[in-house]
Every structure is written in structure tokens, then in C-alpha cells.
Curated annotation (Swiss-Prot):
Family, as annotated: Belongs to the ATG101 family.
Keywords assigned by UniProt, alphabetized: Autophagy, Cytoplasm
Identification of the protein by name: Autophagy-related protein 101
Compartments it resides in: Cytoplasm; Preautophagosomal structure
Pfam families according to UniProt: ATG101
PANTHER family referenced in this protein's UniProt entry, alphabetically: AUTOPHAGY-RELATED PROTEIN 101
Biological function: Autophagy factor required for autophagosome formation.
A molecular-function term among this protein's GO annotations: protein kinase binding
A Gene Ontology cellular-component term: Atg1/ULK1 kinase complex
Gene Ontology biological process terms, A to Z: autophagosome assembly
Record carries keyword Metal-binding: no
Main subcellular location: cytoplasm
Amino acid sequence: MNCRSEVLEVSVEGRQVDEAMLGLLHTILLHRSTGKFHYKKEGTYSIGTVGTQDVDCDFIDFTFVRVSSDELDRVIRKAVAEFKDALGNSGSDGMGQISLEFYQKKKSRWPFSDECIPWEVWSIKVNVVNLANEQERQICREKVGEKLGEKVINIVEVINRHEYLPKMPTQSEVDNVFDTSLKDVQPYLYKITYQITDSLGTSVSTTMRRLIKDTLAL
């Protein structure tokens, strides 16, 4: 099985990191989650509904849609907060990458542990820019919102392709495909990791600075 890999790049102000990452990660998970499975007997089941809610950002002109699961939101917020703290403490000019990996488990014989096989990985490269004044911050607020809107469209286009998804599991195998620990939603098994690096390149940051400069010149 080949693992799909998608890379998104964003350039944001420090106070926008949380909202930008939450918006993108929640958008992906919205399309990679189902309602809870309710098995009647082996081979037959019903799927519960998945509620959604709009989230307005405070520091970006952007609204995203997420699964209305407070449990899932807490997990994502915790991971994003850790990533933001690591960015702030790194001294690497505010560059890093946060990744959302979907995987399925393959049972192994005792005494070996189960094998985790990734089937889709989303990597978000982040560059934090420093702005000089409130005028630049307002422009950045608008431009980042536009860029995130483009990223959301890109995410939806990728997810709507007819490519590999794990097949619906039997009741005995559901934990090999889905995270069943949440009471109100059932995302595909996933993990979030991050790394801080000074080797991401400066193309995104340069583009954002150029956008701000061009807008100021109007």
C-alpha cells in the first residue's frame, strides 16, 4: 500500500499560529471522521450522525468548519499548543512543521506489537513572520485568511479524489481502522507530530512580505 503525502505551506504572524493550524487540521479531520458505529450483529451496523459547527477566528479573517466534538477539539488544541510553544522556544526563526498521519493497524502474532501502516500524511510547513506595525498586521490578517481559504479548497479537492481508504471493518476489527475512544465521533486512526527546523526555506515568508508590501503601496 502506498502512503499518500500532501504538503501545505503557510506563513503567519505569531498570534495566528493557533487558529491557522486548528483551521487546517480540523478541516482535514472533518472529512476523515464518521459517526459512531452501532453494530446490530456481525456484518450489519448503522452509523451515527456527525454534527458540525462554524468557528470564527480572532486574528484572521477566516471561518472554518469543524466536527462538533469537544473531545476531539481538545486533543487537537493540545497538539497545536505544544507545537506553538516549541516554535516560540526554538530560536530557529519560527519555522516548523506539524503533520497529521492517518494509519491502520495490522495485527501481529505474539510477542510482537501491532504494526501501524500509514495511508495518508498531511504536512503543514509553517513560517512565523514578524510585522512592524498594526497596519501590517491588518493586511496580514486579510491575506492569511485568503490563503487559508485556498488551502481549504485544496484539501477538499484532494480528499474528493477516488483514492485508497481503509475498507469498512467488521466489529472485531473496528479498532484497527478507527479511533473509537471518543464518545461522539469516530475519526480514522491518526497521530499528530511536529518538528522545529531552520531548513524549511523562506519562499512562503518572502511571498507574504511581498503581498504586504504591495498592498501598502496601493
